[in-house]
From Swiss-Prot:
Its cofactor is pyridoxal 5'-phosphate. InterPro entries: Aminotrans_V_dom (IPR000192), NH2EtPonate_pyrv_transaminase (IPR012703), PyrdxlP-dep_Trfase (IPR015424), PyrdxlP-dep_Trfase_major (IPR015421), PyrdxlP-dep_Trfase_small (IPR015422), SP_NH2Trfase/AEP_transaminase (IPR024169). It is an enzyme of class 2 (transferase). Keywords: Aminotransferase, Pyridoxal phosphate, Pyruvate, Transferase. Gene3D superfamilies: Aspartate Aminotransferase, domain 1, Type I PLP-dependent aspartate aminotransferase-like (Major domain). Homodimer. PANTHER family: 2-AMINOETHYLPHOSPHONATE--PYRUVATE TRANSAMINASE. HAMAP family: PhnW_aminotrans_5. This is 2-aminoethylphosphonate--pyruvate transaminase. It comes from the Bacteria.
Amino acid sequence: MSTAAPILLTPGPLTTSARTRQAMLVDWGSWDRDFNQLTASLCQQLLAIINGAGTHHCVPLQGSGTFAVEAAIGTLVPRDGKVLVLINGAYGQRLAKICKVLGRAYSTFETAEDEPTTAADVDRLLQADASITHVALIHCETSTGILNPLPDIARVVANHGKRLIIDAMSSFGALPIDASEVPFDALIAASGKCLEGVPGMGFVFANQASLAAAEGNSHSLAMDLHDQHSYMAKTGQWRFTPPTHVVAALHEALLQYNEEGGLPARHQRYASNCKTLLDGMAAIGLRSFLPADIQAPIIVTFHAPRDARYAFKDFYERVKAKGFILYPGKLTQVETFRVGCIGCVGPDGMSAAVNAIAEVLREMEVLDI
């Protein structure tokens, strides 16, 4: 087995740089001025990525990305609102479950796991149901890696006078989203994805006017984004104990993000990773689940080999022993596994991963791929 730390080819947590990990070796006082300045700098840098200064607030929140998604829906959707949830995978299903648990009225529109939702679909659905106030969708559905057509859907939602909530967990920082061109009430992301920080903090880019009007909407004290933002604006501090080391790591990760060249460079590296992965896997006979035109360069789903000697658990452990951690499939009808293209890794690392996978399949005597 490799004695080095494995490379995480997953959708998050990810392999991080030594500099990012080093940033967590310093302790911070949660109410100290230096930490408050760190938080403010972080939010300013995050807003700059979406060109959101002046129109949106960046509201950070402790916890996983799902915490932030739930906070956004609970804060920005009034209790008498109704959400149209667009689904083509497990994370869209989670959006619907959040609405159900929060007691928000909702309807769903579901397409196949390899079929993007179209703007025409959304236009038809909004024409048919005037009671819908908000539309929620996953930008890059992590269960497959499918990319939904966000700009087109956003225009349709805005034309109908409705509000858009975007789960951009697996796309923010790597795929372009400009708040001046894509109208939305909320865009949600997290520290441990394409920014290559560590998990433990989500953040919501909330439309300033919508957030100001959201007082009293939230079902929760801890997840009330209106209260979180108001308190931060007055004091510079988090309401409750912040994940200080996570914030410091993300701040350092953003320095490296900008040194690399920002979003264009991060996108280019991930796209190169994805191409290297797809070409290499095709050469050994492994088929990707999605066609190239709807495949985001974030995570790729592959059909599992048909050979009876293939078993994912054994395959996973053998690849791990060679230094790479993969991800199980999350489809309902087809046996698959997933390989991430993101994190502190480049095309050479992806080539090494493909070689490790090929070696393992030979060791397992898997022939029918």
